[in-house]
Each structure stands twice: as structure tokens, then as C-alpha cells.
Amino acid sequence: MQVLILTVGTTREPLEVALAEHAPQGVVFLASQASHPVAAELVRDYGGSFRHHTLLLEDAESLMEAYQKALLALRKALEWEATAIVADLTGGTKPMAAGLVLALTGRGVVFSYVGGEARDPGTGRVLAGKERLRLLEDPTARLGLKEWAGFTRAWNALNLGMALAELESLLRRDLSPSEARFYGAMKG
């Protein structure tokens, strides 16, 4: 089952693009007091084709609350036994999008964003019919943050064999020249 975690703003069209492109079997809506009606409209119009659950934020500008609700959304997706989870950060406030990304990076979630080139000059929003969905790479995977955390834990515990294994794992990644020199020098 693919589950889409969707931040909801007051503009419906890009969210419809995300729903159509991802075609999820389950959707967890992260909505604010102001955007809850948009989530309700989407459920009314499309809810028959997927399971759905809505999490409501009291303060759409609270990064902490957005982070906590995103973790609850992940928990709901896992309760539904999701085999793939996509988190779309198109709608909602900037703190809602940031909280979603902070909570879900490094957890095997694919991120997506509906953008586009043609924008309304007054609002900056993408023009209807000109939307384009983009899949976004989780930067923690590219940067080797999991391996680096494993290295520091092993090093601090004086488990030098494990620390060496984590460094070797980092050295097998596609690294910049300075990263390769740094990790290589640490390995010795």
C-alpha cells in the first residue's frame, strides 16, 4: 500500500496533482484550521478511492507542532502497513513543510513537491494546468548522515572496529574530493 502524507494549504489544484500523480491507496492530510475545508473537499471528491485520515494543527506556524503531527502521520501510515510512503510538502505554511521534512528525513520516505514555471505575478502561485510534480531526494541519504552517526557512536564507545566499518561505508559513497580526503585521513 502506498500512503501519501500531504500538507494542505488553501490552494486545491497542486494537491489534486499530487493525488493524481501518486495515486495512493491511503492519504494522511496535515491541515491547519484555515486549510481544513480544502482537505474536506478533497476527501469528499476523491476519498472513495483511498483510505484517509486528517491531522489538524492548532497553530500552522508552529514548527514543533508540525514536526509532531508529521510523526503522527508517519505512525498512521505504518499502522496501515504502508509499503511505500511519499510526503508531499507542496501545501500549507512554510513551518508545516519544514516540520514534515525534519520529522521524516532519514526514515525511507520519498518527498515530492508540485511546482511549475508559470506563476501568477501577484501571488507567486503556480498557474492552474501548469503544475509539475517533482520527486525530491532525501538529503540525509546523500550526505551519509546515518553512517556518520554510526561512526561517532562507535568511536565514542571505543568500538574501533565498528567505527572503521562505518568509515569504510562512507568511503564507498559518491563523495566530493574533500569528503574523500577527510574520511580517508580518518581511516588512516
Label the model's feature ranges.
Residues 83-91:
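Short N-terminal targeting/anchoring amphipathic segment
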